[in-house]
Amino acid sequence: MPPVRAEKKRKTDLIEQVCVTNKAGELVDLEDVLEYGPYSLTGILSSEKDEQEPLFDESIVLGYSIKISPVWTYNLKDVPEKETMSIWIVTPQRRYGILSPSSEYKAIYEQISEKNRLFYLIKTKFKDDMISGTLEDYDNYIEVLKEKLELPSCFQAILLVQKHIRFLLTQMVATSSLHVWSESPFFIRIRSSYEHLILQINKNIYNARQERKKSKLSSNNPSDNNTTMKSSLNQALTLINLPEQPFSISSPTATPQLGVVKRTSPLRFPLNDIWLSGLRIVDPNIESISLWKRIQVSTSPKHQRYISLQEVCSVIAQQLQITNLEALNKLSSHGETLLQIMHTAFTWRGTKLFNDIKHAIGFRSSVQQARSQFRGYCYDYLFMHCNNGEKTSLHLLRTLICMKLDFSNAQLAAKILFHFLLFDIGSGLSGSDYTYEQYINHSAVAFSFTEEIFEKNFVTVLPDFVKLFSISFGYWPAFSFYDELLKLLRNKYPKVYSSTPNLCDQVWLDRTNLFPCNRSTRSTLPYRPTKLLDLASASSCLSKKETDFKQDTGLYSYNLEKVEALKVSPDLQTGIWSCPVQNCLYFAVCDNPYKPSQVIYDHLLGHVDSKFIFKTPSNSVRSFTNKLEHIMYNIN
């Protein structure tokens, strides 16, 4: 037999007082070396541990400083006892484990430890789900992080994930286990929102690897330096001899609009999201979090579904001692962040405040989108109102069917039929329509009636049934069932119909059946001032204009025509229009300085719901304010 060759294994050393720097000598995060390497690591040797007895004695004296350069990569090793991961630097001869940082590197090392523990918990959760065979969604990951890290709320866990999102994506994308992570619901959720960041990470890693290859080639072949210099010289000569390109003047670009607050780069929810299709995801700041806490404190859980944006503005205005208009500007400037927070909360998404903020920041809901959101909200409503701790809507359906449907008790029968309506809508297809015939057919089958008998008895409890409809459920007018129900109420009970509020006046839908990907500026009002045209004084300020909506909805838009006293036209030099209302910081950038933008008129109509004072009061301005106050009184 041939003699067994003793292979040389790596020795393991531990380093204390670690400090990591880049080429410029600046302190950097070691776990960014995959993108921005190479780095240099310095420290003091603490102890050593042999993997296998080496053939030659290459031990290093302990207690001496050591420098490892260049560092191109690192390894993470699980530490199950502490529920975290440790960092190891691997060289061709040795492995170096990091024990402790130096005093100047302590702050960065604490962030590294926080990232490693966060990734360990996410990886362990995904591994356990793979073993059990059930992959849970993103919300379950957030709950696990909240419990393991002992955070006060799930929102803090979401903030922690967003804080270290680049590191998490690097670990999931840059390693060879991308095909495994692609099945994780956690990775699918963050990948759809951070695609631009993934592209940037891959580009940086590719550039770092190319630089590493070049450094290896230059170190292995020092004689090739002359050839590289010749090639670079030839490239320079070819660039010099290129034909001269003709000079052209590009078209002037539009003036960029300045935001109220500094936001991050636009990130978007996936298009199949039923609540916020195409809305940006922004990092919350201190002001947005404080506004959210004020909203939570000022509203009780019973009234979460019914509170409106105007009521929230009045409450915040009283707390901060500002006007309602300033409170509305604050809420709308942080509208995307508030929607993101409410989207993660179970009881807030789909509420009236949720939809009001969507309309305030210019988000339009299509009919299909409204139906999907409404069905999801009905399902959530039944989930929250299940009895006996049962968390299935099927249990509620069984209790409804087992109850005797006595039409002599109109109020009880109306409640049972209304809850069955919510169950029937919530269990249907997301974007499909729901008709009156479907409700009669399904209800008759569920409660063991014929369709004729059930419809006759249903008409008797129709007034009590209609009273249960509320705008808090969102987009009732998105279904043809609501229009058919109002027509039946108008024919059978005209007096009740005259006193019943029409929810079409309070809901704004985009009837184009398109899913908008970008946040567009609101060019129309999200409500309908019904008594506006009856005022003779308001006819000179407002004009009626029919839109492309269906005639059965009765939705109209109202726009200001001209108000010369308010200087509607922007500045000719800058193209910027600033609002003349005192303490209002709103401004608009118009592409055509000779033509006022529609956004200006919409902003002026926003002052109708607040008390305001113009900067330069005159007789014409006073007459205009009186008209607006008169309009406001009739709208309310």
UniProtKB/Swiss-Prot annotation:
Pfam families attached to this UniProt entry: DNMT1-RFD
GO BP annotations, alphabetical order: CENP-A containing chromatin assembly; silent mating-type cassette heterochromatin formation; siRNA-mediated pericentric heterochromatin formation; subtelomeric heterochromatin formation
Coiled coil: none
GO cellular component, one term: CLRC complex
Disulfide cysteine pairs (residue numbers): none
Location in the cell: Cytoplasm; Mitochondrion; Nucleus; Chromosome
Main localization, broad class: cytoplasm
Sorted UniProt keywords: Chromatin regulator, Chromosome, Cytoplasm, Mitochondrion, Nucleus, Transcription, Transcription regulation
Record's subunit section: Component of the Clr4 methyltransferase complex (ClrC) composed of at least clr4, rik1, pcu4, rbx1, raf1 and raf2. The cullin pcu4, rik1, raf1, raf2 and the ring-box protein rbx1 are components of an E3 ubiquitin ligase, whose activity is essential for heterochromatin assembly. Interacts with pcu4.
Function: Component of the Clr4 methyltransferase complex (ClrC) which contributes to the establishment of heterochromatin by specifically methylating histone H3 to form H3K9me. ClrC preferentially ubiquitylates H3K14 and ClrC-mediated H3 ubiquitination promotes clr4 methyltransferase activity for the methylation of H3K9. H3K9me represents a specific tag for epigenetic transcriptional repression by recruiting swi6/HP1 to methylated histones which leads to transcriptional silencing within centromeric heterochromatin, telomeric regions and at the silent mating-type loci.
Name of the protein in its database record: Rik1-associated factor 2
Native species: Schizosaccharomyces pombe (strain 972 / ATCC 24843) (Fission yeast)
Gene behind the chain: raf2
